[in-house]
């Protein structure tokens, strides 16, 4: 009677289907329908009860899942397997647990069902039960717990009466009775029928879900339906297996997941196998525990001498962990012996190898007869329990053949990939495995044990599987001897049908081979078919001797036996023999030939020589071990033969008379061979490795001759003398051969090690060379970073010098913009002014070579600022010109030029005095002759410059701009007296601090630069702004901040112009923020006198008040923009607020950043560019370099030949204003400077410590200024002195900051020319505070002064003694001032004419040259566009204001021209003489000083 069966919900699995009309399909369908009658009818027809559907599910699984108890009973009675694995690894026990029916589960457990099994997700039956819901799972889980408790009680040793009372899981089932109570179930009847106590089932096999247990033997049917007895397999607890006290712990792996450990059980030494799971296993890995259960079931049924015997099963207390107790294994797996612990077993005798192979084949044949397929046969599965004794195990993956050819897999766990190296292709591809699959694996083991190589060269299993899938398969190793080669070649065919050789055939071949070896030891070679069979075989491993029957367990015993035989593996004698064998193994010792042909009791080692030597050629050094064994086994056999047969004794008696002679002759030949080998080895030792490749075919077995090497005739004669050797002589020879083989093996190993060491040393040497190259380039690049370690240039280099071009060092990192590939063009564009031997050799930093244009210029400016305002002014202007040229040329590559190059080039003028201080020591070491030569060259160049005859170098398209800079700076590259002030000393430390901070950036920056002027001393490097002129903004890193006087006020407006344009471009620049942090910006020093001229103030009020206000608004807007890399945020409103009414825009000369200049240049047409460059060449512009848009130029008429515009700013001295205005403006300027520096510092670095330092420095500067103020007042300095001192303040050294304030506080009435002697006096006042300069340097300066004394005397006379008396000059200045006040309006035209006459000569000789030098190359790179409207408008206004200023100046300084007419060139010579005395010059150089200008016409 059928009924519809509903599938439990939620069901963990789906039910499969069968779509055919077979009885098996009908069985499944009737089970699903619940038709018990039809199911029983079909079962009576004798169908296969465990037929599976599409998901691998049996009818029992379906019945248990649906909770059909009657179906389960009948299916179990017909032999259905309760532990059958579906494709997902689940069993009918899982299905019964999910159904929640205790009776179904108890029936399955009673039939042998196991509660420990897991599906592929690692879930056991208890987990399935819990997924069925709380209502159904509660009782079934409690039932499982009762079964586990009962099993634990049995294991713990409870009496047998317990099994009598509860002999079946069904007795543990409880169901609700009609009375509401619990009654005990009956396994043989309905649950309601009670069973009498003490009734025991006749089955007598107890299974409670943890394996079958039985109290006595009983019959059972194997898979082949054969009657058999069940063996007793004890179930023990964990505490019964312990570690032995008299032996160390020994464990080894027995496959990928199993580990074997030697322990003791009840006094018996056993080996326990357990699962080696990771510490935190994945859930699916729990299914690996089923492998031990499967092996336990297989091992409990199988008994064979060569199968590892299972002695007991050890269950943990919670029954979750299973361990199998096997017989003791003393050595380990074959895999560990061959590959992991080969050093412990260096010699594997061939006889042992053959015995092991025979044992494995026998065990495998037994499994096949029993209907099992091992499937996982490998060297892991072969366990060597003792020397020469192997056991086959690892049966967990074994398949059992059942009825109708069905194979039963107890685990459904796929074969591990680690075993794919030995597995047959069909096993790897998870196809049906047969006995041919085991033959394939056996062949792999045979090849592995004979070659010491893991199959597939030890590739990973996943790679092997990919190779098999792609159609790649293994072939037999050609190194195998012939019988074994045939076996392997036949056994590893891809297709199973091609594996024609079965295990019985293989066993027969191995047996015969063993017999042949044994018989060959006691018969003549002509009688031995083995020798004849192998002699013609071309393979190198033909002759495999068999060892004795007593292989040693440990290498120590083998070493002892070697010693007993007299072997000395490390002696020179053996080494010499081995060397010869290595050099030409085809030419073995003739005694080996004799031993082969004369006596077969000792195997011939000649083939072994060839076979051993072939090992390196094939790249398989692992052959050495078993090849050594062959020689070694021959020695052992000789020992046995010496003691054994009477035939041997008779041969000794017969050969007695000739034995001693033959032995002596043999020893002599051996000595000869050793000597020859020594000589030959010493000559050709280097080529021994290459000569180890040879072929066994080179040996001529017919005549014994050598095809590759002809031995001496005596050696050939020795062959005939040794034909009648006795066994004693054979023993001695075999001993030598053994030593030879051992040493040959050692030498091969040493050669490999030496080769590896040589490779490593070569790699290390290459790395060291590369590192040294990097370090050399790095050190070269750091030469200018540590500039103080290098001497100053001893003279100007030649004009046509081009620095070398070097490649970038590997250790130097390019900047973030990645523009270094454009740097190789720099050396041609930037000629250096330093000595050729001192230039930078690293291409990465050659972008800063042009910075040396400003190096010498700024150095001379710093010196001139120590008391020569006039010269310093001119030099500052020249520096502006050169700096503009340099910055332009250094950025010719375009707006994306290397930021690090911009960084390095623009900081060249950072270091004012420190570079000279650093190099004082090296300068003192210079040769006096070099100084003299330099002096003469400078003198000659100065003459040319003074007379306007300076030659023009030829035009170079790529270096035209820098050539002008070079020519402009040649007069400046002179030695300077080391006059320093305390502030200069501090500045030296500041530069060192910068250098220390900059070096780790990886850019070898050039910090060896000169100072432009006083402000360069006062201010370090200003971030972001990069032009070279005369004024810098305060650096946050600086330690002192002397006041500027009006110089900073002038620079403030200039700063705005530059900052405004640059801040816009900085947002578009490709430079990284880090690359522009130390870029400096210098500004023109404006006319100080105009600030203090009442007429200038009036002019300012009339003409520029409104534009300045507009500009100030623009300035504030520009400075409100965020700056990259921590640019200074200047509060210009406060800085310029107090002086807005007296600061004309025309007083500021904006020297914009390099990018601005390049952009302007690239944007304009060539014609406009030429006009602009021509305008820049004006001599007037040399005093105030400007590079501005065309709109800023104004047409003007002047006497300079090629100028068509008025300069935008002229820093010529004008008549000073009142004392009060000067003093007040100075104080305002001082406050502005202080505020600016503090604001700038806080915005950039926010370092309270440095801000405090700056404040302290300013306080000290103010105090010093006040002291000098009083000093000036007490010395009755005329008011006219102020103007000159104001001019001085822009260029005076850092050592005289307070002098500026002192000068400001005096009345401004005298001209600049009159103020020089007093300025020198005050400058000397501070110079005296410094420590004395180097005596050697002073001597050099004094020598230069003496050599040019006549010129100096002449200048001193005309200039009233250069130093001049302060009183005379003061008197003249007073007269001049009075004259100016009276005749300012009358002498305007006269002064204009005089000024034109003074400058006419200079213009006439220099204009063309300067114009031509300023012509930029046509290939200048386009730059980014920047807004120029506001700047041009500002410059136009500056020109207007400048014109008015010059008019006022000319009107109030009439006496200046008068004094010039009276004194002639005395004033100018006075300045020059003082300047020359400082520098050691005897004649003037080209220092252009324009005090006034007539360009305003």
UniProtKB/Swiss-Prot annotation:
Transmembrane intervals: none
Amino acid composition bias (Polar residues), ranges on this chain: 1348-1360
Compartments where located: Cytoplasm; Midbody; Chromosome, Centromere, Kinetochore
Gene Ontology MF term list: ATP binding; protein kinase activity; protein kinase binding
Domain Protein kinase residue range list: 227-518
Domain of life of the organism encoding this protein: Eukaryota
Keywords: ANK repeat, ATP-binding, Cell cycle, Cell division, Centromere, Chromosome, Cytoplasm, Kinetochore, Mitosis, Nucleotide-binding, Phosphoprotein, Repeat
Subunit structure, as described in the record: Interacts with KIF23 and RBM44. Interacts with CEP55; inhibiting interaction between CEP55 and PDCD6IP/ALIX and TSG101.
Free-text comment on this protein's domains from its UniProt entry: The protein kinase domain is predicted to be catalytically inactive. The GPPX3Y motif mediates interaction with CEP55.
Protein name: Inactive serine/threonine-protein kinase TEX14
Species annotation: Homo sapiens (Human)
């Amino acid at each position: 009677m059928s009924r519809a069966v509903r599938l439990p919900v939620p069901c963990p699995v789906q039910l499969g289907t069968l779509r055919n009309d077979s009885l098996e399909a009908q069985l499944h369908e009737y089970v699903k329908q619940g038709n018990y009658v039809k199911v029983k009818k079909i079962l009576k027809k004798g169908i296969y009860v465990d037929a599976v559907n599409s998901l691998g599910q049996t009818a029992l699984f379906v019945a248990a899942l649906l909770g059909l108890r009657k179906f389960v009973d009948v299916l179990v009675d017909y032999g259905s397997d309760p532990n059958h694995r579906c494709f997902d690894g689940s069993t009918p026990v899982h299905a019964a647990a999910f159904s929640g029916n205790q009776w179904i589960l108890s029936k399955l457990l009673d039939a042998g069902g196991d509660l420990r099994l897991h599906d592929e997700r690692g879930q056991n039956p208890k987990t399935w039960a819990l997924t069925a819901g709380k209502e159904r799972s509660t009782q079934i889980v409690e039932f499982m717990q009762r079964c586990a408790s009962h099993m634990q009680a049995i294991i713990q040793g409870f009496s047998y009466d317990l099994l009598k009372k509860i002999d079946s899981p069904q007795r543990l089932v409880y169901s609700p009775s009609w009375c509401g109570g619990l009654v005990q179930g009956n396994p043989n009847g309905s649950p309601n029928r009670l069973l009498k106590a003490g009734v025991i089932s006749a089955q007598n096999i107890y299974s409670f879900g943890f394996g079958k247990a039985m109290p006595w033997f009983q019959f059972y049917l194997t898979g082949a339906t054969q009657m058999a007895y069940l063996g007793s397999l004890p179930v023990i607890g964990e505490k019964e297996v312990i570690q032995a006290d008299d032996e160390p712990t020994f464990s080894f792996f027995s496959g990928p997941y199993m580990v074997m450990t030697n322990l003791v059980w009840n006094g018996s030494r056993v080996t326990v196998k357990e699962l080696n799971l990771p510490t935190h296993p994945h859930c699916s890995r729990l299914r690996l525990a089923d492998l031990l259960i499967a092996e336990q079931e297989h091992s409990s049924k199988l008994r064979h001498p060569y199968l590892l015997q299972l002695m007991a099963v050890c269950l943990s207390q919670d029954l979750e962990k299973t361990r199998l107790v096997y017989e003791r294994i003393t050595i380990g797996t074959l895999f560990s012996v061959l590959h992991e612990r080969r050093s412990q077993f260096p010699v594997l005798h061939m006889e042992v190898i053959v015995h092991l192979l025979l044992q494995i084949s026998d065990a495998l044949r037994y499994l096949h007869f029993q209907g099992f397929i091992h499937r996982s046969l490998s060297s892991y599965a072969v366990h060597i329990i003792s020397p020469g004794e192997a056991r086959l195990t690892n049966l967990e993956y074994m398949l059992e053949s059942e009825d109708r050819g069905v194979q039963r897999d107890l685990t459904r766990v796929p074969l591990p990939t680690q075993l794919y190296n030995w597995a047959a292709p069909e096993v790897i591809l998870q196809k049906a495995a047969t006995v041919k699959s085991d033959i394939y694996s056996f062949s792999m083991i045979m090849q592995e044990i004979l070659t010491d190589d893991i199959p597939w060269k030890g590739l990973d299993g996943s790679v092997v599987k990919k190779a098999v899938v792609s159609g790649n398969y293994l072939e037999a190793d050609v190194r195998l001897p012939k019988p074994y080669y045939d076996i392997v070649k036949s056994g590893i065919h891809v297709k199973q049908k091609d594996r024609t050789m079965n295990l019985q055939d293989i066993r027969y071949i191995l047996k015969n081979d063993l017999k042949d070896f044994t018989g060959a030891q006691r018969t003549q070679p002509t009688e031995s078919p083995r020798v004849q069979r192998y002699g013609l075989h071309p393979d190198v491993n033909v002759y495999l001797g068999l060892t004795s029957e007593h292989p040693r367990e440990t290498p120590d015993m083998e070493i002892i036996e070697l010693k007993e035989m007299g072997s000395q593996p490390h002696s020179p004698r053996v080494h010499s023999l081995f060397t010869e064998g290595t050099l030409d193994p085809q030419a073995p010792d003739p005694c080996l030939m004799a031993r082969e042909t004369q006596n077969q009791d000792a195997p011939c080692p000649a083939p072994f020589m060839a076979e051993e030597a072939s090992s390196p050629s094939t790249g398989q050094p692992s052959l050495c071990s078993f090849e050594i064994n062959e020689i070694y086994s021959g020695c052992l056999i000789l020992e046995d033969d010496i003691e054994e047969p009477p035939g041997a004794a008779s041969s000794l008696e017969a050969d007695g008379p000739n034995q001693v002679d033959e032995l002596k002759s043999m020893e002599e030949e051996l000595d000869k061979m050793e000597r020859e080998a020594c000589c030959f080895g010493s000559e050709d030792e280097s080529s021994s490795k290459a000569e180890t490749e040879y072929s066994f075919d080179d040996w001529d077995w017919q005549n014994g001759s050598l095809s590759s090497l002809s031995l001496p005739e005596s050696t050939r004669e020795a062959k005939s003398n040794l034909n009648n050797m006795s066994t004693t002589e054979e023993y001695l020879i075999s001993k030598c051969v053994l030593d030879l083989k051992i040493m040959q093996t050692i030498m091969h190993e040493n050669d490999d090690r030496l080769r590896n060491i040589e490779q490593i040393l070569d790699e290390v040497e290459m790395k060291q060379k590369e590192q040294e190259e990097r370090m050399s380039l790095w050190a070269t690049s750091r030469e200018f970073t540590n500039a103080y370690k290098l001497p100053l240039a001893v003279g100007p280099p030649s004009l046509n010098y081009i620095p070398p071009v070097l490649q970038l060092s590997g250790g130097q990192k390019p900047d973030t913009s990645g523009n270094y590939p454009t740097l190789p063009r720099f050396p041609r564009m930037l000629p250096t002014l330093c000595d050729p031997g001192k230039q930078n050799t690293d291409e990465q930093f050659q972008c800063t070579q042009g910075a040396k244009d400003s190096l010498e210029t700024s150095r001379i400016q710093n010196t001139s600022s120590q008391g020569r305002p006039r010269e310093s002014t001119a030099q500052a202007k020249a520096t502006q010109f050169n700096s503009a040229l340099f910055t332009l040329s250094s950025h010719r590559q375009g707006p994306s030029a290397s930021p690090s190059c911009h960084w390095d080039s623009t900081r060249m003028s950072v270091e004012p005095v420190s570079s000279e201080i650093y190099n004082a020591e090296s300068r003192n070491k210079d040769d006096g002759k070099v100084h003299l030569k330099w002096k003469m060259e400078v003198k000659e160049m100065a003459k040319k410059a003074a007379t306007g005859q300076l030659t023009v170098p030829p035009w170079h398209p790529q270096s035209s701009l820098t050539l002008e800079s070079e020519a402009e700076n040649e007069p400046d590259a002179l030695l300077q007296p080391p006059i320093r002030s305390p502030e200069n000393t501090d500045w030296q430390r500041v530069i060192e601090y910068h250098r220390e901070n900059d070096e780790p950036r990886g850019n070898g920056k050039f910090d060896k630069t000169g100072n432009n002027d006083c402000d360069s001393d006062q201010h370090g490097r200003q971030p972001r702004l990069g032009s070279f002129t005369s004024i810098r903004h305060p650096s946050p890193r600086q330690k002192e901040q002397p006041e500027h006087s009006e110089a900073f006020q002038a620079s403030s407006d200039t700063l705005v112009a530059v900052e405004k344009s640059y801040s816009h471009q900085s947002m578009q620049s490709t430079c990284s923020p880090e690359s522009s942090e130390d870029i400096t910006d210098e500004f023109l020093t404006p006319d100080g006198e105009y600030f203090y001229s009442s007429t200038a103030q009036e002019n300012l009020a009339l003409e520029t008040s409104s534009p300045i206000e507009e500009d100030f608004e623009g300035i504030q807007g520009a400075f409100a923009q965020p700056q990259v890399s921590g640019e200074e945020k200047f509060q210009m409103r406060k800085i310029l607020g107090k002086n807005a009414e007296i600061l004309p825009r025309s007083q500021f000369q904006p020297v914009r950043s390099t990018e601005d200049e390049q952009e302007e240049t690239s944007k304009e047409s060539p014609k406009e560019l030429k006009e602009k460059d021509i305008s820049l060449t004006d001599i007037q512009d040399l005093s105030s370099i400007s590079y501005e848009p065309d709109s800023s130029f104004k047409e003007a008429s002047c006497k300079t030949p090629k100028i068509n515009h008025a300069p935008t700013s002229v820093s010529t001295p004008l008549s000073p204003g009142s004392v009060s205005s000067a003093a007040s403006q100075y104080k305002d300027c001082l406050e502005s400077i202080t505020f600016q520096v503090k604001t700038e510092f806080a915005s950039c670095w926010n370092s309270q410590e440095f801000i405090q330092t700056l404040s302290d420095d300013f306080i000290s500067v103010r105090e010093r200024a006040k002291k000098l103020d009083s000093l000036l007042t007490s010395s009755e300095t005329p008011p006219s002195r102020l103007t000159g001192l104001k001019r001085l303040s822009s260029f005076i050294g850092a050592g005289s900051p307070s002098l500026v304030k002192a000068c400001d506080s005096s009345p401004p009435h005298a001209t600049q020319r009159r103020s020089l002697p007093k300025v020198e006096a005050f400058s000397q006042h501070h110079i005296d505070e410094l420590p004395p300069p180097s005596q050697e340097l002073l001597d050099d300066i004094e020598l230069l002064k003496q050599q040019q004394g006549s010129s100096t005397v002449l200048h001193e006379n005309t200039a009233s003694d250069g130093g001049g008396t302060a009183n005379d000059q003061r008197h003249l200045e007073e007269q001049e001032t009075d004259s100016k006040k009276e005749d300012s309006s009358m002498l305007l035209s006269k002064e204009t004419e005089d000024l034109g006459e003074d400058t006419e000569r200079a213009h006439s000789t220099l204009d063309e040259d300067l114009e031509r030098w300023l012509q930029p190359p046509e290939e200048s790179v386009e730059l980014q566009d920047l807004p120029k409207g506001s700047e041009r408008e500002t410059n136009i206004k500056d020109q207007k204001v400048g014109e008015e200023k010059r008019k006022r100046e000319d009107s109030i300084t009439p006496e200046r021209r008068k004094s010039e007419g009276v004194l002639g060139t005395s004033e100018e010579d006075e300045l020059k003489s003082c300047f020359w005395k400082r520098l050691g010059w005897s004649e003037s150089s080209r220092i252009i000083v324009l005090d006034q200008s007539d360009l305003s016409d």
